[in-house]
Structures are given as C-alpha cells and as structure tokens.
Amino acid sequence: MNKEERAKRQSKIRNFSIIAHIDHGKSTLADRILEKTNALTQREMKAQLLDSMDLERERGITIKLNAIQLNYKAKDGEEYILHLIDTPGHVDFTYEVSRSLAACEGAILVVDAAQGIEAQTLANVYLALDNNLEILPVINKIDLPSADPERVRQEVEDVIGLDASEAVLASAKAGIGIEEILEQIVEKVPAPTGDSEEPLQCMIFDSLYDPYRGVIAYIRVVNGTVKVGDKVRMMATGKEFEVTEVGVFTPKTTQRDELTVGDVGFLAASIKNVGDTRVGDTITHAKRPAAEPLAGYRKLNPMVFCGLYPIDSARYNDLRDALEKLELNDSALEFEPETSQALGFGFRCGFLGLLHMEILQERIEREFKIDLITTAPSVIYKVFLTNGEDMIVDNPSNMPDPQTIDRVEEPFVKAAIMVPNDYVGAVMEICQGKRGTFIDMQYLDETRVTLTYEIPLSEIVYDFFDQLKSNTKGYASFDYELIGYKPSKLVKMDILLNSEQVDALSFIVHRDSAYDRGKVIVEKLKELIPRQQFEVPIQATIGNKVVARSTIKAMRKNVLAKCYGGDISRKRKLLDKQKEGKKRMKSVGSVEVPQEAFMAVLKMDDN
C-alpha cells in the first residue's frame, strides 16, 4: 500500500473493547457483533466464541483477553474495519483489562438493565477514563421481566457521570440494538492517531507460545508499518529477530503482508525464548528504531503467594516448563523454586488474587497434566526486628523467632462493597469478623449502598468473596485496592505431629483468632490422619507455647486373647511388654501426612 491508501484505511479503523461487570452479558454481545458483521458462517458460530479456553466456557467467565478484526458496512455506505478486544470482568483480572484498553480508542460499557452498576463496572470505567477512551454506554438485557432501563440510565449519569441520553437499549441475547451499537462505534469512536511513515512502534499486549512457530506476540501498531522479512528489535530486552509472519484474527489467524497504524494483530519471528517478549514491551525496527518505547503497563505486583508442588516429584521439571509457558501470557505470575521437608521440591508462586491462583492451578493440571499440591495462600508481611533491621516475609516458614521481632506489618486494602439495602447488616458483620475498619457508607439510590472498609489483605485472600456472595444471595459486588501496610498483632502458628514440625502446615495468623484456628486445624487433622501403631499427639504451637492439642489413639492388638481366666500377673506381663514395644515404636516412628489432610486443612473455613 502507498501512503494515501494507508491514510484512507487508517481513517476507517475503529478499535474498541467491551467492559462490564461479570455476567452482564459481555461475551454474548461480542458474539452478536461477530454475527452482525458476518465474521463467521452460521456453522462456525458457537456461544461465547471468544472465550477459547475450556475453563472459560465451563465457568462462564472471561479470563484472557482476545482480539479480533471485523469488517462492517455502515449506513453511510462506507466499509469500516472494527477491532474488538474482549476483556475479562473479574477483579483478579483487571490487569488483563488495562492491557486491552491500552490498545483501544473506545469502549462499550455494558450495564445490566436489571442489576444496574456494580463495583467492577466502576473499576473498569475508571481504567477506561485513565486511558482517555470514548465510552459508549449500552443498557443490556432489556428483555428481562425485571429490567428497568430508565433507572439504570439515571444511575449511569449519577454514579459514573457519563451522559447516558443516547445510551443504546439492547438485548444481546435477542439481538436487539446491535446495529445501533455498531453505528455509534463508527460515529463516536475516534480513528487511531499515528503516522505510517514514522519509525515503527508496536505495543505487545499479549503473547502465546506455539511449539512450531515459537512465541507469537499480539500487537497493536501505534506508528509505522511492519512487514514480513523486517528485522525488528524488542526495546526492553534489546533482542533482534526477523519477522516470519504478520496477520490479524478474523477469529481465525489470517496472514497479511503488512500491519500498519491502528492494526491489531499478531507477529511471529521464530522467537524461541519465552523471556524475550515481555508483555507491555515495544517492538521497533532494528535499522530505524523509535526514539523511545511506548508507555507500557506498570508491572503488577502479586498479592497472594502459595507453594505449588508436583504430587509426583519426578515431574518437577515439567512443572517449571509449565509455569514458564503460562508466565508468557500471564504477566502477573511470578515464581521461584523452594523446597519443603514434607512436600519435596516445588515453586513459590505469586498471584493477583485467589481466583487467579485457582485458575492457574487448574490450567496446569489440565493443559500440562501435572497433579499439584498447594500450600495455604499467604500475603507479603513486613517484619521489623529488635536489632533495627527489617525483612519481607512471603512464606510462613521464613518468619523469624518471636523473641527477635519488634513488630509485624501487613498489607491493608480499601474495599468498596456495593450491596442492596437488605444485606447491609450481613455485610458489615462479615467485614467486622475479618478485622475490617468501617470508613464510609453511601446510598447510590433508594435500594443500593456502597460500603467502604479497610480490611487486611490476608483476610480477603482466605474466603471473603465466598462469604460475601453466600450471605447476600450473590447480590454484593466488590472491588479492592491496596492502600499500604499497617502494624498488626500477628503470630506464626506451627503444627507438630509426634513433636515434629510439619513445615507445609505453618501459617501466620492474628493473635486474637490463633486459639480458635489452631483448635479447628488440630481436630481436622485428627480425623484425617490414619491411626498408627502408637499414639500420635497433634499440637498447634506459637513459639514454644502449645495452644491446642489432640491425640490420635494407637491401634492395638488384643494380647490377652489367649489368656483364659488365670492370674493377673500373667496378663500384666503381656500388657507391659506391648506397652514397651509401642514406646520404642513411638521414638523411631514417623507419621505420614496423607494428601487429603493437606488439602482439607488448606481449604478449611474459619467457621
């Protein structure tokens, strides 16, 4: 293409994404837009087409972002090129959202006509506003009997401050209002700015590993043009590669000769090493590089840590490969090797939240067929010692001796919880039970309230979300952001079996709830550990102090079975002999903790 053709094409490009709270109908709307623009034949169409991972379809949530190119003939008779970038809605995956928004100029904000605005809707809108996107509100599910589009329209104006007078009333399921949405995209979303003659700048917003083609980078071209055969350089790592193919997704990968300004597509350059393409990096030409890289995304810091161990220790290397490949398109995952006496070799991994951790575990078990054991999730604590030093602890087994600790600080989050009036009491109770501090309460309208609390992250990590959902019949929605560290009375609790510490069961807990938590764990282990030939004490300790104890009784053979009547001293002798043997066994015996016992303790509720 020459310069004029490129400029004409650029003026017809519209890059947009769809943002919404979980379950407000985002993936269904994406399906309808694909149908309307004839991206697929009827035969290829299936529900939630862009959710390509099995896990996404099973759970009905979007985890990874997806990009797709559509051609649309608008009412003004012109052909437009639309790039739809699908995003997840769950709080753990906001970084996926911020990545896809950085590649767009506009966003469709989908709000459920029955439920109205939820916490995640707000969080994603603010991300979109930070990226200066044009936001088009769409009120979805208007065919529901409980829909109240006018109330929701008012809510969008009051709560978010967007003009919703032209908001499209739609039903993605019934296919109502889809054309209107497409027309608004064409009219209101600006065409990409940028110059195809400038030095090349492409933003990598995702990447995949293909065993035949190496690493495939998903890119958005901001300036310049990239063709097959070009030598390109990654600006963060300085590595250079020759481009082997470029193309776009029309859901299927379709090869092209070149990608130019505003295009969203993929680039392969037989990149073998996973570490050479960082998400958020800028690609430029090796011969005529751009002066500076694009503003990437900030590196996300993991909030939750846990140990992952292969059940079969021979698969340790497979687990490392699996983590490396997943890290490639999951930039928020971090991991480093660690060992445990109870579980052998494994990795300490950092995640954004519990859902992220669960999804990752499942992906490893499914995609790489590795069975895993996970240790209890923990957060990063700051420990200040009496000698004036301080250290960072993300693993309970690294906690120093209680005598040397001056104070411990833990991360706190500011949680905004949106909830119907009827459940305010229940939510406040949960937050107080989780050591939350009440900050603020605001009424959104007559029926809904936003509660703001400061809560320790370690309490949220555990089962906060489940409790919130189950106590509000699923109506509460919640979003949180880190606000920093504050001192807390925290202690490390160890579990001893037969007076030997089991490192994988140690955890850090608040002093006030230590006794209850210890008691529950000890009882749980008593049920799950099989009886031995000798009696096994299970103790929960803080430092040298035992706070809870329970005993697994020994199995014993009836040694008196062969005595009929007769003298007590004969029986005594046999019983003493048995006792002696049990004592000897106890001093040398070790207790195996079965897999189920680990799992049960880690999944344990506080209640």
Curated annotation (Swiss-Prot):
Chain residues that bind GTP: 23-28, 140-143
GO MF annotation: an example: ribosome binding
Superkingdom per UniProt: Bacteria
Main location (coarse class): membrane
PROSITE patterns given in the database record: G_TR_1, G_TR_2
Catalyzed chemical reaction(s): GTP + H2O = GDP + phosphate + H(+)
CDD domains: EF4_II (cd03699), EF4_III (cd16260), LepA (cd01890), lepA_C (cd03709)
Keywords for the protein's UniProt record, in alphabetical order: Cell membrane, GTP-binding, Hydrolase, Membrane, Nucleotide-binding, Protein biosynthesis
Compartmental location: Cell membrane
Record's protein name: Elongation factor 4
Gene this chain is encoded by: lepA
